[in-house]
């Protein structure tokens, strides 16, 4: 990564602009909503978007409106492709082996938020959609 932006900060738009003075070449999109719109508006010519999720709208009663900055994707000739994890089911074993190796080598740092107890599942799910966890959200159930 060249830079990061705290999407929960009040000044995330300023952070995004400062972090991308020359625009954005690649977006690994998992959130959607306002941040995706702001990123789309800053995409460079021949940029690429890997659309892997849109979690900001998963709990909405009505689908969110389309991005207002969608026209920039056309003008900049951006390539947008959706990716679903099940498309790579045949490679899960390979992925687990490689990722485990990288974690063991310290090349990938794994952070977790652990919630204790089966009865806390509803709270944990709400935490997930509210972005209140760091890293993976794990519910530990005593056996």
Regions picked out by a protein language model, each given a short descriptive name:
Residues 1-143:
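Terminal helix/beta-alpha structural elements that buttress the NAD(P)+-binding lobe
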